[in-house]
Design a protein with these regions (language model features):
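Short acidic (Asp/Glu) and glycine-rich catalytic loops that position anionic groups and cofactors
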Residues: 128, 189-193
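Long, charged, glycine-rich C-terminal linkers/tails
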Residues: 165-167
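Short small-residue beta-strand/loop micro-motif enriched in glycine and branched aliphatics
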Residues: 2, 130, 197-198
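Predominantly flavin-linked oxidoreductase catalytic cores and closely associated redox partners
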Residues: 23-163, 175-180
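A conserved FAD-binding loop/helix module that cradles the flavin
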Residues: 193-207
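FAD-binding beta-loop-beta segment adjacent to the flavin cofactor pocket
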Residues: 112-115, 169-190, 199
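Short histidine-centered catalytic/ligand-binding loop motif
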Residues: 5-9, 134-139, 201
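Dinucleotide-binding Rossmann-like beta1-alpha1 core, especially the glycine-rich loop
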Residues: 1-35
Length: 207
């Protein structure tokens, strides 16, 4: 099956962030500050952010603070599922992958009562991202994601010799609960906390 004239593109978060930061650093009116945010307070004329022991005031604050461990669905009317995943970028000793043919939903992995699948994004005949993904209300112990990946690579891809070049993991809320666009007169939520996760796929930027 061909996607023509469409194409599937993989956008690495780190590449996007570097591009955005390089652009912003070139602007004379932008200053970067890296510090833990201690509080965000709303006001009628301005909002205040306290970070690293200092308080900063602005007419508008764009809030992207989101911690999946603290996100809870308390209203029974809404779904409380999560999309959670671990992926490995692997390199093989022989040609294995077709760079023109990604695998999007491979359900040849034990389901254990919830939807689980693996997708493969090949970069070259010997390099690919192999990602184990599932939808459930509860997360797995970290070792279980690794075990599922090892089993899939061995049993389905028939690979025993490969190198793990990079790893990634994440948790994305998959809920129909409305996300407030504002948390005050002067505070606007963006990113995941602003409800900007694509509902059909879970694709999103955390911040």
């Amino acid at each position: 099956y061909t996607l023509a004239p469409f194409r599937y593109h993989m956008l690495r978060g780190i590449d996007f962030y570097r591009h955005a930061q390089d652009t912003l650093r070139s602007l004379p009116n932008v200053t970067f500050l890296q510090a833990p945010v201690e509080s965000v307070q709303d006001g009628s004329q301005h909002a205040q952010v306290t970070a690293g022991g200092q308080t900063y005031a602005a007419e508008w604050v764009f809030n992207s603070l989101f911690r999946s461990s603290e996100f809870k669905i308390t209203d029974p009317r809404y779904q409380d599922d999560k999309q959670h995943f671990t992926g490995w970028e692997i390199e093989t000793e022989t040609d294995v992958f077709n760079p023109q043919c990604p695998t999007m939903f491979d359900f040849r992995t034990p389901q254990h009562g919830v939807m689980r699948f693996v997708y493969i994004l090949p970069f070259s005949p010997r390099q690919a991202l192999v990602e184990y993904t599932l939808f459930s209300a509860d997360l797995l112990p970290p070792a279980e994601y690794d075990l599922a990946l090892k089993s899939y690579i061995q049993d389905v891809l028939k690979l025993t010799h490969y190198r793990i070049q990079a790893e990634e993991s994440g948790v994305i809320p998959m809920t129909d609960q409305p996300f407030p666009r504002r948390t005050g007169q002067r505070i606007l939520n963006i990113g995941t906390i602003g409800g900007r996760v694509k509902p059909s796929t879970g694709y999103a930027f955390l911040r």
